[in-house]
Amino acid sequence: SLERIADSLEKKAHNEVDDKVDVAVESSDDTNENENMDYGCSVKEIDVNILIDKLQEKNITVKTYVDSSHENTSLDNVAYFMGNRYNDIRKVYETIKRHLNKPNGFHLDLKNATQSEISASCQLCTTLYDIAFLSEYKYDKSPRYFIHATPNKIPIAINFLTGHWLEIFIRKTIQDSLKSLPAAIEYTYLINPQIILPNGNDFELDVVFLINGEIYWVEGKTGNYQHYINKYSHVANMLNLDKNHSFLVLTDVINPNTTYILSKTFDMTIIPVEEFEEEIKYVFHENLIP
């Protein structure tokens, strides 16, 4: 019953949330490391300039980028949790996002939510509160089943919650997927590089990897993909990337038929966020294993 769920969450939330998020990802990392040892294969990160030169061969000039050695990876586990449990956290995440530019907090009714949605929503809010991305958070158990929260209007929280979490999720998912492959892997990547396209236009890529000499480009959108999808498709053509090398990961498409039609219509693989990990593992298995 909802009352039992609420009672359980109320007692365990602050003790278990970070552990659940961290342990889930750490367990995945441990599994990947064991798989690497079993196969006797290596995953090596190489010089990012090799990727920059590869893009230059396609007449793509990289103007600026963030060195991966300076990248803040402390939010990896939160982003990974959000991506893999997105259907469960959708309602609370979208509510948080809407209130980032509002002065007050919000009250979210979970009376009609599933057990999985309640659990994931409380886990996310507790974690965001613990890392000060929410300035206030409280969960009312039976009979109210309300989340009360206020987003913290600080730059790092706003940047993360408006979409950077999805880029982190994509990058981490790709890195973890590479570790699980029974093949020798050499890779490097860029996050948010500012580039000049062959036609002279400025553009920003979300996540671009070079893996065993092949470029993989992934964009992530947490809303309004309709305004960008045609442009992304044109850029994929400029980069000469097929649908196994160019992806658009979406959070706001619920109907599977929609992503199927989009992928058939545009020159990219368009996929919901919760299906990205399975899809990229399949693509890597097909492309990278001899």
Q: Where on the chain are the PLM-derived regions?
A:
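Intrinsically disordered, low-complexity Ser/Thr/Pro/Gly-rich regulatory segments
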Residues: K20-P290
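Extended alpha-helical segments
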Residues: S1-D19
